[in-house]
From Swiss-Prot:
TM stretches of this protein: none
Function: Part of the ABC transporter complex MetNIQ involved in methionine import. Responsible for energy coupling to the transport system.
Molecular function as annotated in GO: ABC-type D-methionine transporter activity; ATP binding; ATP hydrolysis activity
Amino acids binding ATP: G41, Y42, S43, G44, A45, G46, K47, S48
A GO cellular-component term linked to this record: plasma membrane
Protein name in the entry: Methionine import ATP-binding protein MetN
Reactions mediated catalytically: L-methionine(out) + ATP + H2O = L-methionine(in) + ADP + phosphate + H(+); D-methionine(out) + ATP + H2O = D-methionine(in) + ADP + phosphate + H(+)
């Protein structure tokens, strides 16, 4: 599929308090049309700075930007991209933010209509003209229905909940039929329930409109809910990027693993083991295993297989299965009991089946 966003070897530098700061360093990111692409990192990682180069709200120092096949920035071969051309380009990229930036003195309806005040369309002769008042009103009405706010059109921002305010911001961001929607920490100010509702809305809009979504966040749970691809940033650099499924199945960087652990109930269970006597109570011929598996592996009776093949017994302490992009991912925490030879054979079987596992409680003495 064709990339709608190409950021090639981008660097962003600026002076702050008398020193040169490199906010983004040699970052390359290609986002395909129709992606929901999560860019995750802690505060100061450079993720917002990077993504704001997409519509040139932040001008890079070095590198190249190509949007929908059009080069809009090239540090080696400068591109003239200013004035009316830049304004028209930016209309095709919607943005929502952590803070909703609504106009307090305007109604919900007029907040959305505000984004249409300079909007133009082509007439049947190919000439551009401004929208009529009726066309603007019809467009706003359509957008408010799309974000489930049709019955709140005459309300003011002060009368709305946080989730409703963000819905207004989303409607406003969609006013000019953008091909790209950027969410810059768009759920950070919301409670968990409202966050899920907004993510469901973004997913629905993505499906209905075919819009490409770029999701900036410091929360892996947000990425996990709706993204199909992920880039992880640290200290201005993209340290890892892949499909959501591959990131969760085979994370390479320590930071990526940390982010994944924040979304995993199995990791919370493992962390709680230190407060129990479970590890101390393991028999001499048993050990505690954490096992991860995904996709077709879930269809195979792995635990049943090892008990039959290798003369070991198991006791499951924890189990969980969840879906990522429609693909199941599972975790087990279980004891493996048997002779050292048989336990070693069972673990070799895990390796043979390409299952990820770790020994949580490893014994020093075995009884054969």
């Amino acid at each position: 599929m064709t990339a709608i966003i190409e950021l090639n070897n981008l660097s962003v530098q600026f002076h702050q308090k008398g020193r040169l700061v490199t906010a983004v360093k040699n970052a390359t990111l290609h986002i395909e049309k129709g992606d929901i692409y999560g860019v995750i990192g802690y505060s100061g990682a450079g993720k917002s700075t990077l993504v704001r180069t997409i519509n040139l709200l932040q001008k890079p120092t070095e590198g190249q930007i190509v949007i929908n096949g059009e080069k809009i920035f090239d540090s080696e071969n400068p591109v003239k991209f200013t004035g009316a051309k830049l304004r028209e380009f930016r209309q095709k990229i919607g943005m929502i933010f952590q803070h909703f930036n609504l106009l307090s003195e305007k109604t919900v309806f007029n907040n959305v209509a505000f984004a249409l005040q300079h909007s133009q369309i082509e007439d049947k002769n190919g000439k551009k003209r401004y929208l009529t008042k009726k066309e603007k009103n019809d467009k706003v009405t359509e957008l408010l229905k799309l974000v489930d706010l049709a019955d709140l059109s005459d309300k003011y921002p002060a009368q709305l909940s946080g989730g409703q305010k963000q819905r207004v911001a989303i409607a406003r961001a969609l006013a000019n039929d953008p091909e790209i929607l950027i969410s810059d920490e768009g759920t950070s100010a919301l409670d968990p329930k409202t966050t899920n509702q907004i993510l469901d809305l973004l997913k629905s809009l993505h499906e209905k409109l075919g819009i490409t979504v770029v999701l900036i966040t410091h929360e892996m749970q947000v990425v996990k809910e709706i993204a199909n691809k992920v880039a992880v940033m640290q200290n201005g650099e993209i340290i890892e990027q892949n499909s959501l499924i591959d990131i969760f199945a085979q994370p390479k960087e320590a930071l990526t693993k940390q982010f994944i652990e924040t979304t995993s109930s199995v990791n919370r269970f493992i962390a709680s083991l230190s407060k129990t006597e479970l590890l101390a109570q393991l028999a001499d011929d048993e050990e505690l295993i954490h096992l991860d598996y995904s996709g077709s592996e879930l269809e195979d009776p792995v635990v049943s297989d090892i008990t039959k093949k290798f003369d070991v017994t198991t006791n499951i302490f924890y189990g969980n299965v969840e879906l990522l992009q429609g693909q199941p991912f599972g975790s087990l925490v279980l004891t493996l009991k048997g002779s050292s030879e048989h336990r070693a054979a069972a673990k070799a079987y895990f390796v043979e089946r390409h299952l990820k596992f770790e020994v949580l409680g490893k014994i020093e003495r075995t009884v054969d």
